[in-house]
Amino acid sequence: MVILVHCVMGQIHWTNLSTIGIIGTDSSHYKIMTRSSHQYLVLKLMPNVSIIDNCTKAELDEYEKLLNSVLEPINQALTLMTKNVKSLQSLGSGRRQRRFAGVVIAGAALGVATAAQITAGVALYQSNLNAQAIQSLRASLEQSNKAIDEVRQASQNIIIAVQGVQDYVNNEIVPALQHMSCELIGQRLGLKLLRYYTELLSVFGPSLRDPISAEISIQALSYALGGEIHKILEKLGYSGNDMVAILETKGIRAKITHVDLSGKFIVLSISYPTLSEVKGVVVHRLEAVSYNIGSQEWYTTVPRYVATNGYLISNFDESSCVFVSESAICSQNSLYPMSPILQQCLRGETASCARTLVSGTLGNKFILSKGNIIANCASILCKCHSTSKIINQSPDKLLTFIASDTCSLVEIDGVTIQVGSRQYPDVVYASKVILGPAISLERLDVGTNLGSALKKLDDAKVLIESSDQILDTVKNSYLSLGTLIALPVSIGLGLILLLLICCCKKRYQHLFSQSTKVAPVFKPDLTGTSKSYVRSL
């Protein structure tokens, strides 16, 4: 048994569209960032240097003073907010006490606070770790010498802990203890800590102005993480392809929820989205090549991106999307309806595809698709590099499709391209393609056309008002006009009737006189007739 499978290229008629210069250059899956998840990340700013404590005490003390200058203002703002946000356990008194979840803010103690700061303060209160969890976290970090570690709490929540300078201490300083003097080790660690402090200042500097509502991007946080951003994202469960999209869309954000001055660490609440692929939706990218009709250069106006799902075709707004490795990842829904005329255009009815003049802007003169060159050789120089012959395009042709059977090595617009076997027809003749209506996209042209249309509408309005006045005049004089017409008609009919009566009367009299007149030579035969009958005669 042989099963024949027919491969459907999609709902878009690429063959017909290619005749008017529309080429599909790329197709991507459609993914949306759904509701964000939250993960705690602890950034330990002071490395564990118990092995080399004697050599680095002075450098660590100086570094600690610098850290306090950054951490103390942030800690004061966080403490002020968390102390003045309390849980609202109940309302009312007695047996009929109503209980519900919520928080209440002591506005008098806070003083001036914006709506964003109050909202961030409530979120800070709800996401803040309790004192017991902080104490357990501090003890775990003091015993850890790993650059990246996972700390499991009693509630089974996993906290990712990062020690920014610990890798340098473990891999550079400790192995060099036998080869370098104690003073040199202290100097090297001091330089590293000073550099790390400048990175911290660049990351958390904005938080000094507004520690409550300030957000930190994961890109900025990567400096404080010691360049371990990929490992952190892998801990959050992102794949390699998704990782690039998440970073480009700045989907991962972090907020400071706690500062521990004694342990010298910061607790960050990281918000990261979940990617969800919309099955069946394919996003297509369209490119337009200009074509010539006589001396005028045109191109077809189509959206840059469209999406297909089954038989449906819709518009696609790429402003909130990032395109990476066969995927379009968007921070919101980017699909919206498409007009029926544009759908007919994409399904192959070229008469429904609008076109506009290439004026003042440089459009695509050629494009490489499926190994073939689709070019408007009437507006640019197309030359076969192998034979040094010019590839001409006659005026009755819209486009020229160049493949290896025409020329294997093509020089076009100063670029030399090696083409493959033929995938498109040789040429497209203007007489065989039904072109769509011409429109203007330039702002000045659109404004001029709109002004002309408005003027024509005003002129038409004046003419309509004049015609209405004429119709009103005719309507008012309808009875007098009818009377004037009926009067001569009635007189004429009366005269004709009298004339007919006279003619008929004369004709009747003439016939009657002929029927009663007796000829004088006529003598009746009265033989055998009685005298009385003769007398009667």
Swiss-Prot record:
Glycosylation site residues: 16, 48, 54
Cellular component terms (Gene Ontology): host cell plasma membrane; membrane; viral envelope; virion membrane
Subunit and interaction comment: Homotrimer of disulfide-linked F1-F2.
Protein name: Fusion glycoprotein F0
Family recorded in the similarity comment: Belongs to the paramyxoviruses fusion glycoprotein family.
Membrane topology field: Single-pass type I membrane protein; Single-pass membrane protein
Modified how: The inactive precursor F0 is glycosylated and proteolytically cleaved into F1 and F2 to be functionally active. The cleavage is mediated by cellular proteases during the transport and maturation of the polypeptide.
Localization terms from the record: Virion membrane; Host cell membrane
Domain of life of the native organism: Viruses
Leader peptide range in chain numbering: 1-10
Residue ranges of coiled coil: 125-153, 449-474
Disulfide bond entries: 321-330, 345-353, 377-382, 384-407
UniProt site (Cleavage): 99-100
Organism: Phocine distemper virus
Cytoplasmic side: 505-537
Function: Class I viral fusion protein. Under the current model, the protein has at least 3 conformational states: pre-fusion native state, pre-hairpin intermediate state, and post-fusion hairpin state. During viral and plasma cell membrane fusion, the heptad repeat (HR) regions assume a trimer-of-hairpins structure, positioning the fusion peptide in close proximity to the C-terminal region of the ectodomain. The formation of this structure appears to drive apposition and subsequent fusion of viral and plasma cell membranes.
GO biological process: fusion of virus membrane with host plasma membrane; symbiont entry into host cell
Topological domains annotated Extracellular: 11-483
Pfam families: Fusion_gly
